[in-house]
Amino acid sequence: MFGFQAAGAAPIVLGHVVEKPKTIATAIRIGNPASWAHAIKAVQESNGKIDLVTDEEIVEAYRMVAALEGIFCEPASAASVAGVIKMQKAGLFKDGETAVCTLTGHGLKDVDIAIAVSQKPATIQANMEDVVRVLGY
């Protein structure tokens, strides 16, 4: 089992309480987790790992999940995807292995982040030619 904490709020990875946790992933902006010991136990029993991901990696995964899967998750859920991407790039998965990420938080829990990291909508004329052009067909 693998777990991922935001770099600005990674007390388990760092091994100490983070007094002022900071991350865009508000649901995991925790400097002293109540289940710290349980998390360590789960990692040890599963021969897993807890690592950190940056806010930039979280945003990249957040956008990717929306664009490729049509899933509007919150940044804390995207942190798991960011972590798996990071691990895959580091060569920690063998070809053919499957990784599963649990994305339990809906994007509506953190709409301000969605607005902040989204591209500004295109303004076009109300005609088919412009619609086709903007959609890239």
Q: Language-model segments: which ranges?
A:
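Phosphate-binding loop/pocket of nucleotide- and phosphate-handling active sites
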Residues: A82-Y137
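Substrate-binding/catalytic subdomain of NAD(P)-dependent oxidoreductase enzymes
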Residues: V59-R63, L68-K86, E97-A99
